[in-house]
């Protein structure tokens, strides 16, 4: 309720001045906000993800072919602790369905599935949940750069797939679909934008439907323009910020 009221209060009443600058990462960046007025300077910039591409800060986490799963810690996400929301999925069922899918992929492609662990996930519990598979924390960038393809639900890690022109497979489960919330909506958005068919692990659709592990150059380029980089400058993010706001 407080957030609802605060958003609708005039800035002058709250003694808050409009923003001097807003940095936008793509043509679809949302710049509708009470803090943005006709006095605010809109500065095109790329996302911080693109800085990683510029700096070349990529260490090969492993030296052989593999498939990357981007973990989002859905059964025990730390955000649930401070909210009244129930877990999106049940732990036992979720990891059972995931590991069955991973077993299938490892058999089909003859390479291991490794896990890009959610940064706030428990590493010890993850080892158990993923049946001893290789797990890497804070290595999502490097893992996707060198991967055969990536498995995601609705993660921002899709940015890395686009940057490195790597295919990705969208997955869901019956429990995720039953939620009908912003997370399921995010999956649908990615499905529509990239024309990717979402694989439902609960119904084991991967056993009968061929997985698409290629990518559409046009949709990747469009995503880059819309959400990552809207100009031709290759100046690093913080250099642009410093140059813009210097007094």
Model region roles, listed by residue range:
Residues 29-34, 53, 77, 120-127, ...:
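Short, charged/polar "capping" segments at the starts of alpha-helices
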Residues 2-84, 219, 244-247:
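A nucleotide-sugar donor-handling region in carbohydrate enzymes
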Residues 21-23, 43, 68, 114, ...:
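Hydrophobic/aromatic beta-strand patches that form the interior of the parallel beta-sheet core
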Residues 50-124:
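Conserved catalytic-core segment of nucleotide-activated headgroup transferases in glycan assembly
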Residues 127-130, 156-232:
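Catalytic binding pocket for nucleotide-activated donors in carbohydrate/polymer assembly enzymes
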Residues 19, 39-40, 110-111, 165-167:
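A short helix->loop->beta-strand "cap" motif at the edges of active sites that frequently abuts
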Residues 228-247:
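C-terminal alpha-helical cap of glycosyltransferases
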Residues 47-49, 54-55, 96-99, 112-164, ...:
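Donor nucleotide-activated moiety binding/catalytic core segment of transferases
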